[in-house]
């Protein structure tokens, strides 16, 4: 009896996605300074003269 291909064990085409994409750059260019400044502003609120 021949092997049935109704439930393949391995995908035929496996895509390898790049890590650094335009979306990744956009998210990090906007996100990293935003988190930094939010942390800096929060720290400034806690300073008592």
Swiss-Prot record:
Gene Ontology process terms (BP): photosynthetic electron transport chain
Matching SUPFAM superfamilies: Cytochrome b559 subunits
Membrane topology: Single-pass membrane protein
One matching Pfam family: Cytochrom_B559
Positions of transmembrane segments: 24-40
Cofactor: heme b
Presence of keyword Cytoplasm: no
Cofactor comment text: With its partner (PsbE) binds heme. PSII binds additional chlorophylls, carotenoids and specific lipids.
Any GO CC annotation of this UniProt entry: photosystem II reaction center
Family membership noted in the UniProt record: Belongs to the PsbE/PsbF family.
Known role: This b-type cytochrome is tightly associated with the reaction center of photosystem II (PSII). PSII is a light-driven water:plastoquinone oxidoreductase that uses light energy to abstract electrons from H(2)O, generating O(2) and a proton gradient subsequently used for ATP formation. It consists of a core antenna complex that captures photons, and an electron transfer chain that converts photonic excitation into a charge separation.
HAMAP family (alphabetical): PSII_PsbF
Name under which the protein is recorded: Cytochrome b559 subunit beta
Organism: Prochlorococcus marinus (strain MIT 9313)
Name of the gene encoding the protein in the UniProt record: psbF
């Amino acid at each position: 009896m021949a092997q049935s291909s109704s439930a393949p064990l391995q995908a035929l085409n496996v895509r390898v996605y790049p890590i650094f994409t335009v979306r990744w750059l956009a998210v990090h260019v906007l996100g990293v300074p935003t988190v930094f400044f939010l942390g800096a502003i929060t720290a400034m609120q806690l300073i008592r003269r």
